[in-house]
C-alpha cells in the first residue's frame, strides 16, 4: 500500500507499512505460535488475509485547525496537526463526505477544540459506514452543549448534500483528556441505528455500540466461529462480552438456547433487534457484567464463547470455568498475549484449533479465534 502521509513522515500509525504483506502475515503467525506452545495446539489453521487498503468502515478524526479551515485527522504530541482525509485505509468514497463535513463545520460555526488553550467545542468526528446498505452514521464529539442549537439548525443542508447520513448525533465529552467520547448522546435523526449484514445475519449499529473496523475480516471471523460451533452439535451456549451479538447470532439456530451478555445496554438493544429479525426465540440478551453473570450461575451450558477486551477474561472467570468445566470454550481475542495467559490458567482444556484473522493490516496487531476442548481424562 502506498501512503503519502507515511512517506512524508507525517503519520506512522501503520508501523509495518514497509514490510511486504506476506511477511506481515508470517510474522504475526510466528508471534502467535510463540505465545501458544505448539505442544498443546492440535491444529494450526492458516491465517486469513485482509484487503491491504480501503478496508476500514470507520474513521475517528481529531478536529483541529480553524472553524473556516478545519483539519480532520490526528495531532502529534507537539500539537502539530495532520489532515488524514486521504488516508488509504479509508474507502475512496469517504473523501467527498469529509469535504462536505468540513464545509458544514464552517457553516455551523463549530469551532475546533484547541488542546493547548482548552478552548473550542468540536473535538472529534466519528464516521461509520454499513458496507451492506451504504448508510452512514456521523457523530460530532463536542466539549459542551453550547453549539447544539446552531448545529441542529444547519443540519437540513447537510442532509440534502449527504442523504446517506441516516444517523447523526452529538456526543458530549467535557473532560480535557484524550478520551474519545462521553456518556451523553444527543440524536438528531429519527433513525437510531443502521443495519450491517454479514453472511445473511443482520447486525444493528447504534452510536455507542462497539463494532469491528474491518468488515471483511469481521465477516470471516463470525462465519468461522459459526462453522466451528455447528460442527460440535451443541444445544446450549453463552456468548460473553457479546457486543451487538455478532458471534452468538452466527452460532445459534432456532433450536439453540443462547444467552448473550454485554455491559452496554445500547449494544444489547441492537442484539435483541437482530434476534427478533431472525425469529430466534430461544435467545436472550442481557445488559450485565459478563464475569458477574457467569460466576453467579451454578449450571453452565455446553459451550461458552468469550470475546473479551484486550485485558482478557481474567482470573475470576478462568477459575469459574475451570471449576464448572463446560465441554467447549471458544475464545476470540484481539490480544493474543492475554489470551495465552488465560488459556494457561485453563489447565483442564486442550487447544483443538486456532486461526489468525488479520483485522489490522500494517500493524503488529491481529485477531485470533481458538477452540478449547475439555480433557475428560
Swiss-Prot record:
Pfam families hit by this protein: tRNA_U5-meth_tr
GO BP annotation list: rRNA base methylation
Root EC class: transferase
Catalytic residues, chain numbering: 334
Top-level taxon: Bacteria
Keyword annotations: 4Fe-4S, Iron, Iron-sulfur, Metal-binding, Methyltransferase, rRNA processing, S-adenosyl-L-methionine, Transferase
Alphabetical list of InterPro entries matching this protein: 23SrRNA_MeTrfase_RlmC, MeTrfase_TrmA_AS, MeTrfase_TrmA_CS, SAM-dependent_MTases_sf, U5_MeTrfase_fam
MF terms (GO), sorted A to Z: 4 iron, 4 sulfur cluster binding; iron ion binding; rRNA (uridine-C5-)-methyltransferase activity
The EC number(s) this enzyme carries: 2.1.1.189
List of residues binding S-adenosyl-L-methionine: 212, 241, 262, 307
Binding site for [4Fe-4S] cluster: 3, 11, 14, 87
Catalytic activity entry: uridine(747) in 23S rRNA + S-adenosyl-L-methionine = 5-methyluridine(747) in 23S rRNA + S-adenosyl-L-homocysteine + H(+)
Main function: Catalyzes the formation of 5-methyl-uridine at position 747 (m5U747) in 23S rRNA.
Similarity comment: family membership: Belongs to the class I-like SAM-binding methyltransferase superfamily. RNA M5U methyltransferase family. RlmC subfamily.
UniProt name for this protein: 23S rRNA (uracil(747)-C(5))-methyltransferase RlmC
Gene: rlmC
Amino acid at each position: 500500500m502506498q501512503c503519502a502521509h507515511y512517506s512524508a513522515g507525517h503519520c506512522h500509525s501503520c508501523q509495518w507499512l514497509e514490510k511486504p504483506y506476506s511477511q506481515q502475515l508470517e510474522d504475526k503467525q510466528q508471534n502467535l505460535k510463540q505465545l501458544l506452545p505448539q505442544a498443546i495446539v492440535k491444529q494450526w489453521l492458516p491465517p486469513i488475509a485482509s484487503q491491504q487498503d480501503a478496508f476500514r468502515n470507520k474513521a475517528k478524526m481529531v478536529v483541529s485547525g480553524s472553524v473556516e479551515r478545519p483539519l480532520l485527522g490526528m495531532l502529534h504530541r507537539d500539537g502539530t496537526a495532520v489532515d488524514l482525509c486521504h488516508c488509504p485505509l479509508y474507502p475512496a468514497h469517504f473523501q467527498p463526505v469529509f469535504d462536505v463535513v468540513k464545509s458544514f463545520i464552517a457553516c455551523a460555526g463549530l469551532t475546533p477544540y484547541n488542546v493547548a488553550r482548552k478552548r473550542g467545542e468540536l473535538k472529534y468526528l466519528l464516521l461509520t459506514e454499513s458496507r451492506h446498505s451504504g448508510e452512514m452514521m456521523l457523530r460530532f464529539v463536542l466539549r459542551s452543549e453550547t453549539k447544539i442549537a446552531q448545529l441542529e439548525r444547519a443540519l437540513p443542508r447537510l442532509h440534502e448534500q449527504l442523504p446517506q447520513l441516516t444517523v447523526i448525533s452529538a456526543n458530549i465529552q467535557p473532560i480535557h483528556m484524550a478520551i474519545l467520547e462521553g456518556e451523553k448522546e444527543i440524536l438528531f435523526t429519527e433513525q437510531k441505528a443502521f443495519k450491517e449484514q454479514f453472511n445473511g445475519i443482520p447486525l444493528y449499529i447504534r452510536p455507542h455500540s462497539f463494532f469491528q473496523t474491518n468488515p471483511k475480516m469481521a465477516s470471516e471471523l463470525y462465519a468461522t466461529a459459526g462453522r466451528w460451533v455447528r460442527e460440535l452439535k451443541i444445544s446450549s451456549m453463552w456468548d460473553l462480552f457479546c457486543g451487538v451479538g455478532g458471534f452468538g447470532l452466527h452460532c445459534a439456530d432456532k433450536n439453540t438456547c443462547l444467552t448473550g451478555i454485554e455491559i452496554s445496554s445500547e449494544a444489547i438493544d441492537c442484539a435483541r433487534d437482530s434476534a427478533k429479525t431472525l425469529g430466534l426465540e430461544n435467545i436472550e440478551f442481557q445488559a450485565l457484567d459478563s464475569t458477574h453473570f457467569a460466576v453467579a450461575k451454578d449450571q453452565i451450558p455446553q459451550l461458552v464463547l468469550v470475546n473479551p477486551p484486550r485485558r482478557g477474561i481474567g482470573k475470576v472467570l478462568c477459575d469459574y470455568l475451570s471449576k464448572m468445566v463446560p465441554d467447549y470454550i471458544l475464545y476470540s481475542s484481539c490480544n493474543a498475549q492475554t489470551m495465552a495467559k488465560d488459556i494457561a490458567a485453563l489447565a483442564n482444556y486442550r487447544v483443538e484449533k486456532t486461526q489468525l484473522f488479520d483485522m489490522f493490516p500494517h500493524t503488529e496487531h491481529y485477531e485470533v479465534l481458538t477452540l478449547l476442548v475439555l480433557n475428560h481424562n
